[in-house]
Curated annotation (Swiss-Prot):
Protein name, as recorded: Chaperone SurA
Chemical reaction(s) catalysed: [protein]-peptidylproline (omega=180) = [protein]-peptidylproline (omega=0)
Main location: periplasm
Protein EC: 5.2.1.8
GN (gene name): surA
GO BP annotations listed: Gram-negative-bacterium-type cell outer membrane assembly; protein folding; protein stabilization
Pfam families in UniProt: Rotamase, Rotamase_3, SurA_N
Length: 428
């Protein structure tokens, strides 16, 4: 959504009247004006892609479900003390402007020219960043890929053939809950087959995705962006290399339901780097939580930094305080790392810290860090780069599946009461 901020007309200058509640979501509500505004945004996005624009009534259930999931994640972020500072927000806005080949001032002017509010745009970006950090903590951090999985993947025909090719895809997901009965699964299969038949006869993929798909990207016409084939569920791996652009795959059952893919574009892989800079670094991570505020977390990181500066042992303090389970027991040692594999905030601080010196406390999506650079080197990374690429596609594949499962879980566990006239009640 962020990358399409300008194109989609996603932020409106005029504040719409809050006329009625359409959903109660745990401790918050969603107003009809919010839903109506999002429906208009989706219609504008679909229209700019040249697809047929669905009626507002057809989009309302999908839009409301998206707003409910966003609301639940924002509430989680609030309870967990996740905040986005103005400096972080300014940096994100700068990145969005750069992606649109603009300066920030040009970006603001372009928004104003289109009758859009820069202040509303900032708040939309802030919400997206909070949701991203919630997902990082709740989903991405618990995904594990073993060395054996990487080796097996690289040795497989799928791994050898697919690491070098990328596909721009759109998808339609007909979801099946974990507890779905055999009749419900059969009904989903029939629905997916019916949609596939419509698509083969020339039906508008983006329009059908926006009105029927349960996928996270349904309201973007199902657009998934660029993916390695290996990142996708196994049934699709062998189909995509030989599939003509514009074609769709038959429905395939996955853990989340029945998926149909459309191939939008195809491109060859990037060349592998032969040499790579690596940094030997150790760090201490302190995370905010429901019982420790952002400010208290920052203060604790500052105190640890001062203790190290005053001569206390870094490794000992890391074992006592660090909340990074992968490095705490090793005294915070991350060993030799590729800077490009790290989140930008960590990478930038590490790059600017001289060898043998300590950084001041700094913040990333994971929490507050103190790091020490122990060494730098250039290494032949041909094999390591391929291992890292395999690790990345396996993690992304698991993340996509885990995210859908987690979103269903938080939706099922929440109290949600739908008050939209004519909608099915979904209170829990």
């Amino acid at each position: 959504m962020l990358g399409a901020l300008l194109l989609s007309g996603a932020v409106h200058a005029a504040v719409q009247p809050l006329d009625s509640v359409v959903a109660i979501v745990d401790n918050d509500v969603i107003m009809k004006s919010q839903m109506d505004q999002r429906v208009r945004e989706v219609q504008q996005t679909i229209a700019k892609r040249g697809s047929g624009v669905p009626p507002a009534a057809d989009l309302q259930p999908q839009v409301l479900d998206r707003l409910i999931l966003e609301n639940l994640q924002l509430q989680m972020g609030e309870r967990s003390g996740i905040r986005v500072s103005d400096d972080e927000l300014n940096q994100a806005i700068g990145t969005i402007a750069q992606r649109n080949n603009m300066s920030v001032e040009q970006f603001r002017a372009a928004l104003a020219h289109d009758g859009l509010s820069y202040e509303d745009a900032r708040e939309q970006v802030r919400r997206e960043m909070i949701i991203s950090r919630v997902r990082q903590r709740r989903v991405a951090e618990r995904i594990q890929v073993s060395e054996q999985e990487v080796k097996n993947f690289l040795a497989s025909d799928q791994g050898k053939a697919q690491l070098s090719e990328e596909f721009h895809l759109a998808n339609i997901l007909i979801a099946t809950p974990d507890s779905a009965s055999s009749d419900a699964i059969q009904a989903a299969a029939v629905k997916a087959k019916s949609i596939y038949d419509q698509l083969k006869k020339g039906a508008d993929f983006a329009k059908i995705a926006a009105t029927t798909s349960s996928s996270e990207n349904a309201l973007e016409g199902g657009d998934m962006g660029w993916r390695k084939a290996a990142q996708l569920p196994p049934p699709f791996g062998d189909m995509l290399s030989s599939m003509p652009i514009g074609d769709v795959t038959p429905p395939a059952r996955t853990p989340g339901g029945f998926i149909i893919l459309k191939l939008l574009e195809k491109r060859g892989g990037q060349g592998q780097a032969q040499m790579r800079d690596e940094v030997h670094v150790r760090h201490i991570l302190i995370k905010p939580s429901e019982i420790r505020s952002e400010e208290a977390t920052k203060l604790l990181a500052q105190k640890i930094y001062e203790r190290i500066e005053n001569g206390e042992d870094f490794a000992t303090l890391a074992k006592s305080f660090s909340e990074d389970p992968g490095s705490a027991l090793n005294g915070g040692d991350l060993n030799w790392v590729d800077p490009n594999s790290l989140v930008p905030e960590f990478r930038d601080v590490m790059s600017s810290t001289p060898q043998g010196e300590l950084s001041k406390p700094f913040k990333t999506a994971y929490g507050w860090h103190v790091l020490e650079v122990l060494g730098r080197r250039a290494t032949d990374a041909t094999g390591q780069a391929r291992d890292q690429q395999a690790l990345s596609v396996l993690r992304n594949r698991k993340y996509d599946e885990e995210l859908q499962t987690w979103l269903r879980q938080i939706r099922d566990e929440a109290y949600v009461e739908i008050k939209l006239p004519g909608a099915t009640q979904a209170a829990q």
